[in-house]
Amino acid sequence: MDAVNAFNQELFSLMDMKPPISRAKMILITKAAIKAIKLYKHVVQIVEKFIKKCKPEYKVPGLYVIDSIVRQSRHQFGTDKDVFGPRFSKNITATFQYLYLCPSEDKSKIVRVLNLWQKNGVFKIEIIQPLLDMAAGTSNAAPVAENVTNNEGSPPPPVKVSSEPPTQATPNSVPAVPQLPSSDAFAAVAQLFQTTQGQQLQQILQTFQQPPKPQSPALDNAVMAQVQAITAQLKTTPTQPSEQKAAFPPPEQKTAFDKKLLDRFDYDDEPEAVEESKKEDTTAVTTTAPAAAVPPAPTATVPAAAAPAAASPPPPQAPFGFPGDGMQQPAYTQHQNMDQFQPRMMGIQQDPMHHQVPLPPNGQMPGFGLLPTPPFPPMAQPVIPPTPPVQQPFQASFQAQNEPLTQKPHQQEMEVEQPCIQEVKRHMSDNRKSRSRSASRSPKRRRSRSGSRSRRSRHRRSRSRSRDRRRHSPRSRSQERRDREKERERRQKGLPQVKPETASVCSTTLWVGQLDKRTTQQDVASLLEEFGPIESINMIPPRGCAYIVMVHRQDAYRALQKLSRGNYKVNQKSIKIAWALNKGIKADYKQYWDVELGVTYIPWDKVKPEELESFCEGGMLDSDTLNPDWKGIPKKPENEVAQNGGAETSHTEPVSPIPKPLPVPVPPIPVPAPITVPPPQVPPHQPGPPVVGALQPPAFTPPLGIPPPGFGPGVPPPPPPPPFLRPGFNPMHLPPGFLPPGPPPPITPPVSIPPPHTPPISIPNSTIAGINEDTTKDLSIGNPIPTVVSGARGNAESGDSVKMYGSAVPPAAPTNLPTPPVTQPVSLLGTQGVAPGPVIGLQAPSTGLLGARPGLIPLQRPPGMPPPHLQRFPLMPPRPMPPHMMHRGPPPGPGGFAMPPPHGMKGPFPPHGPFVRPGGMPGLGGPGPGPGGPEDRDGRQQPPQQPQQQPQPQAPQQPQQQQQQQPPPSQQPPPTQQQPQQFRNDNRQQFNSGRDQERFGRRSFGNRVENDRERYGNRNDDRDNSNRDRREWGRRSPDRDRHRDLEERNRRSSGHRDRERDSRDRESRREKEEARGKEKPEVTDRAGGNKTVEPPISQVGNVDTASELEKGVSEAAVLKPSEELPAEATSSVEPEKDSGSAAEAPR
């Protein structure tokens, strides 16, 4: 009994809840009942007691409890072992008598459950049919419920039609029919006439009608025979699945209704069920809409018997004899009644226009008007299937239809608004076509089993069709088509029916209920964001609900349609969803809120134009419903609404704004082809930060669009590389930023820019490429940190080489030295760089982009300047050191130790030596544009050592970078002579801190480099140590040695590269230098290389030319020693060691 008591408590706790009852609660009750299955009789009695004693609003929840318990028991234990179903059926009539005491609006839910039971075989038809009839009887008081009952009940009981209840119903219906407005009866009959047989019946009816009073009482036997034959056909056609009657618009509605019941059958959704039906109706205003829809269903079911009955109206129905001949008398009475409304039917057929007015009240009347349309005959076929149930349904349907129709003025209006259906029938001779069309209109229709448009919307539509026809017969098809299209668009946008003289404020706010208290905003957002953007989410955890404001009405509508159908869960808890009143609607207007449609219909005379804008909060204004006098005021809301609805973005999209953006992008697109265009684009971007890459991003985006075109054009670009360079550059990060600044002047003559770029590019790129490759090779061999060093060196070297080459130099230097050094090098190279700023940006990119070729650009960038440039920023700290070393390294290789080149000296690029010479490498060195001046500055000893050895150029570099003296070690004689290692260290420290910064702007790096060198030096020292057995570590501090070793390695690596290059041109020199180098390194390394070093430093300025030659020799010497060494790496290391040892020795 504990289980029974628990169930009792659980069930009666419903009283404490406000309907609708949640699914979770229903599940708890069901579980408690199943637990008490051993005392199932007690459980059944408790439920019946609850239904008997509860308040009217809890009647339907009590029915849901019965349904849930029975279905769960059947599912869990099987239909054979289910004990609850049979027990409930014993006293079910009394129970349903209490159930029908529920509010009239809930009776449709009871019928819904009965239909589900019938459909799923929960109870036998013999049990269900009387209950449906009971609903019909109560429906006399409450026609809506009756309609639903008839529609849905009748299809399942079709066979039962002949049963006594139908017969009784028929007589009842007969009186009802006379009572019904003729228009209502016509609505029902009209649907019947839609079938082909119905049309035949129509003809017969016309014969009846021809005499103002049909000869119904004295129907000719022939006529009766015809009617019966048609009825028989209808019966036979019913062979189509009875569900097909659903195909018939009314039956379909029922089917849709059933399906809705099945799909959405949720105890929580009690109110929603009604809402759903309305939703399915789309325009159906209220449950009456479903009821109205239902009446069509009855007619559909009636078709077999009812269709004839309708055709000859009621009399045929009885005569049809489904119930039996006995029925005929009532049928005749019906027929007499029919006589009263037949003239109207005739009138409608003859003059639809006149009868329009009556028809609208009966949403179904339009169907009657449709009769003339042939397309409906196919529809009639679907109707046929329902024939067996037709009689009862028909009788009930008359009553039900009658009231539903009267109750459905809104539906009628909506339907009227749906002229589309008219055309649908016109365009589609096939029932199916029209059906599919309507189905497409409303998703629910689609879902209906039969596939025919759901009866509600359909029959509504069919009504609208006939009505439209009558009403709009004068209208041109094109106009109707436009109207239909507009209506369809509105439906797709989720906009409700338009009411005359009424403003529609469509809510975009959804209410989601029954949420678990742990549910987060993210959970809700993830549920709804798939439908569209969410404006805001307001969670109310205590109430377990949330208000979600969607940006677009259409998205909210789709979310509601989908989530209200299936069993969607958040945090494993089923949710409910419904329209919520948007915040903008104040209390004064809440009375106009329609929760079913999610719209507030505010009469124009109640609207204050100044409030229109506020209505849009959490909703949108339906621009089609606004008073033309307000248009100016609500435009903002309208625009927002349009955007929200996704409907009229045109309003919100100011044409001007669109053109503005479009023009900009458009020019960019053409720009690729017309090089001239890009400059304009670039300038706009340039205005902000022309030189900085930042521009590039802005320019980049437009150029991005262009660059792809540019690349497309890129194919052609080879011929016009300069032009392409702009677009290409714009696409390229560097070019866009830099090019814009540089190109503006040279844009017209991009060629002019490219030439500078080209020489520097070609030379620097080749040289740089060589240098980078050599550096990488040497570094990889000599330096444990070759990658970093190589990157730095490569960058530095490339920068130096560029500097050395004049025009090329500025870009490279700037590119390599994006930091302050860039400006300084530029200043040093001022003569060389035309536009240091722009050139730097442009040239560097150009170097990186060698050709204006798109392909090359990306490729070269990584290997060439661009990559160094890019790397440089990140590697700047490490590179600065390697750059000095590298710069000096290369200089030693090429011209001895002209370290200044690293700063911008051309000496550093001996590999470019030939170029350097023509470029004025000596000149640069001498004049001090880059190398000379810097070297003179840094190389205090340069003049003295000019005569001395190739190292002279290197010597200056050495003073600048003591370690670079060791690169001379690669040219060993100079390095050894460059004893200034001590001096170098001093110079480095002194000059690096001051001079280097001044000259190269890198000196800051130089100092860093020394520190880095220490880091790298350790690594290099290790490698060097292996190769530098000669060095005496004791002479100098390991740090210094490490620095020197690093520098030497860098120099050697660069030197080797330079040497290789120089060796090509100066093999003989190399031989000479090798001899010298071998002798000198030893002497300098361990004798007093400092002296020798000093003269080279002093000589640097004068020795530039000589240094270049000597560099070649020194390189040769270095190369040879390196060759002599077991491996290049070791060789490079050993010379470094030698120089390092020499440097150490002086100290």
Curated annotation (Swiss-Prot):
Residues 434-475 have a biased composition (Basic residues). Residues 424-433, 477-492, 1009-1085 have a biased composition (Basic and acidic residues). CDD domains: CID_SFRS15_SCAF4, RRM_SCAF4. It comes from the Eukaryota. Signal peptide: none annotated. Residues 508-582 form the RRM domain. Residues 283-292, 299-310, 941-965 have a biased composition (Low complexity). The modification N6-acetyllysine is found at K49. It is linked to Fliedner-Zweier syndrome: An autosomal dominant neurodevelopmental disorder characterized by variable features including mild intellectual disability, seizures, behavioral abnormalities, and various skeletal and structural anomalies. This is SR-related and CTD-associated factor 4. It comes from Homo sapiens (Human). The gene is SCAF4.
